[in-house]
């Protein structure tokens, strides 16, 4: 008699999913995303080939790149894609593992909800677990870079490269990455030492083998001088950085000038030329001997620049000029007009560098800005057989540079190869049993979820994951149960997987290291993303509005 109103009556156009269904859907979406990148984890991970709608091909191993090229429709899936991009932006590496951990945490949380554990309890448990994990990682697992020396920096870069296309030449490239980061060392206003990744410019040149790549001290611009009559080297450079056109100034469209004397027409033309020439003169009079601009330069202006013995480069990338301006202390100007509307150029706008020179790499020429005043910069010129491998090399290099930066700034590293995850897993299992509340179930599941990393690593290396993970757990359990005095057993905490030989080894001695900051960030981000999705219990999707049909549609 009293019928419960159907849910559909509330929404005229759309669907409402709630309770278990929405959780299952979310888990399904996140697992699908994690499965896409799962097989690319680790030193023997495989690459993915992505073809977009116009047919552009990308071959990559980088989790963030793979996910950003996918067109994900499900909102829960989008959360994971954003998570990978965030990790890429903040740390640069660990994008694949962060997605895998988040998806696994969510899957296990969903199983608990099915067993009648309230999501809030699970969330509290996860938060407790991450707090303990972070504490254990910083106190016990991480070791300082100073105690391991510069070698450890190279090892950190090698570990980051091991899964990438340049993994075979990791000795060569890791040294290059470390040297590049050390050469751009700078300190900010608070006196903290910083290593800006953006100060390292990466150029790609086709041809030769990847081992012929070079690290150049100075900022390399993929441009050439505007005229062959110019100098190709300027010492003690004073650099003007412009984002404006030095072509002849044409009158704006729609301007009508009525003249009754042909001489006046000639005067107008002369004036058009003179305006730009005056601009160039102002810049040269301020002491500039190198002019870099994003737009074109007129031939007449080039003549006066050549006569002044200066150097000009046109059509540079704006992003490059922004970085050069920052490094040399110049101001990037988009117009010479000051607040009064008069055109001026002051010498304070100029940046300074020891020299600006045009050099030749294989068949390509590029401009190098060396010895910039504000902070030094470095450039890496990558060589490779084709565009796909060069793009992938650039991504791998970026990851390695970011990892070296994080290691230098935080000064702490942890062993790689699944060592951290296994150690945390054992620690959290023991911690869970010490609790009496329901949260212990969530913490135990959290501990199990972390083992997905060593398992996936082993599976990708075509090794027996069950056996290797069990061995690894045994080592870490022995380490955590050992007496403080038993140094040998305590040292087992650094044991991780050696995936090439399928054995367990001390990864600190083997040089498989990762910045502890990367691990901390990825764990925290994974838990936050998982909790965000876990809190969702209803999803309401509205249908797109239907446009009323035009009755005159066929009559036009």
Swiss-Prot record:
Role this protein plays: Molecular chaperone; assists the folding of proteins upon ATP hydrolysis. Known to play a role, in vitro, in the folding of actin and tubulin.
Keyword terms: ATP-binding, Chaperone, Cytoplasm, Nucleotide-binding
One annotated GO molecular function: ATP hydrolysis activity
Domain of life assignment: Eukaryota
Coiled-coil region list: none
SUBUNIT field: Heterooligomeric complex of about 850 to 900 kDa that forms two stacked rings, 12 to 16 nm in diameter.
PANTHER family in alphabetical order: CHAPERONIN
Keyword NAD: no
Membership in a protein family: Belongs to the TCP-1 chaperonin family.
GO cellular component: chaperonin-containing T-complex; cytoskeleton; cytosol; nucleus
Record-annotated disulphide pairs: none
Protein's name according to its UniProt entry: T-complex protein 1 subunit alpha
Location of the protein in the cell: Cytoplasm
PROSITE patterns xrefs: TCP1_1, TCP1_2, TCP1_3
Main subcellular localisation: cytoplasm
GO annotation terms (biological process): protein folding
Keyword rRNA-binding belongs to the record: no
């Amino acid at each position: 008699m009293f019928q419960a109103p159907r849910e559909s009556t509330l929404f005229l156009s759309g669907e409402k999913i709630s309770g278990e269904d929405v959780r299952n859907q979310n888990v399904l979406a996140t697992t699908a995303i994690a499965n896409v990148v799962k097989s690319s984890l680790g030193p023997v991970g495989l690459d993915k080939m992505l073809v977009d709608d116009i047919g552009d091909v990308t071959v990559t191993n980088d989790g963030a790149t793979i996910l950003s090229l996918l067109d994900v429709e499900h909102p829960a899936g989008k959360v994971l894609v954003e998570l990978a991009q965030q990790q890429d932006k903040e740390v640069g590496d660990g994008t694949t593992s962060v997605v895998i951990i988040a998806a696994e945490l969510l899957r296990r949380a969903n199983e608990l909800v099915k067993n009648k554990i309230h999501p809030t309890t699970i969330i509290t448990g996860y938060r407790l677990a991450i707090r303990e994990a972070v504490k254990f990682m910083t106190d016990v697992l991480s070791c300082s870079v100073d105690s391991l020396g510069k070698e450890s920096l190279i090892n950190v870069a090698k570990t980051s490269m091991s899964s990438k296309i340049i993994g075979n030449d990791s000795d060569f490239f890791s040294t290059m990455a470390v040297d590049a980061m050390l050469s751009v060392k700078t300190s900010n206003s608070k006196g903290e030492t910083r290593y800006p990744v953006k100060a390292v410019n990466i150029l790609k040149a086709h041809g030769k083998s990847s081992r012929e790549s070079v690290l150049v001290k100075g900022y390399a611009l993929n441009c050439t001088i505007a005229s062959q009559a110019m100098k190709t080297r300027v010492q003690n450079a004073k650099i003007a950085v412009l984002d404006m056109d030095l072509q002849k100034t044409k009158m704006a469209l729609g301007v009508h000038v009525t003249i009754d004397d042909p001489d006046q027409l000639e005067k107008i033309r002369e004036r058009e030329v003179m305006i730009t020439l005056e601009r160039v003169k102002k810049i040269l009079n301020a002491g500039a001997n190198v002019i870099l601009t994003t737009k074109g330069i007129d031939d007449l202006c080039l003549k006066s620049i050549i006569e002044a013995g200066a150097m000009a480069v046109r059509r540079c990338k704006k992003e490059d000029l922004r970085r050069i301006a920052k490094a040399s202390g110049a101001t990037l100007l988009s117009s010479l007009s000051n607040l009064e509307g008069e055109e001026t150029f002051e010498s304070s706008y100029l940046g300074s560098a020891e020299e600006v020179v045009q050099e030749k790499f294989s068949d390509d020429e590029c401009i190098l800005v060396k010895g910039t005043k504000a902070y030094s910069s470095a450039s890496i010129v990558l060589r490779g057989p084709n565009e796909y491998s060069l793009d992938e090399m650039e991504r791998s290099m970026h990851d390695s540079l970011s990892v070296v930066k994080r290691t230098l700034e935080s000064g702490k590293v942890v062993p790689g190869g699944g060592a951290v995850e296994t150690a945390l897993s054992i620690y959290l299992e023991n911690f869970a049993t010490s609790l009496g509340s329901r949260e212990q179930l969530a913490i135990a599941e959290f501990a199990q979820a972390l083992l997905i990393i060593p398992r996936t690593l082993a599976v990708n290396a075509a090794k027996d994951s069950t056996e290797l993970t069990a061995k690894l757990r045994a080592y870490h359990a022995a380490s955590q149960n050992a007496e403080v005095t038993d140094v040998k057993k305590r040292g087992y905490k650094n044991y991780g997987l050696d995936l090439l030989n399928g054995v367990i080894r001390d990864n600190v001695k083997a040089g498989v290291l990762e910045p502890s900051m990367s691990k901390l960030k990825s764990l925290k981000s994974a838990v936050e993303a998982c909790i965000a999705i876990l809190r969702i219990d209803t999803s309401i999707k509205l249908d797109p509005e239907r446009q009323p049909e035009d009755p005159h549609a066929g009559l036009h």
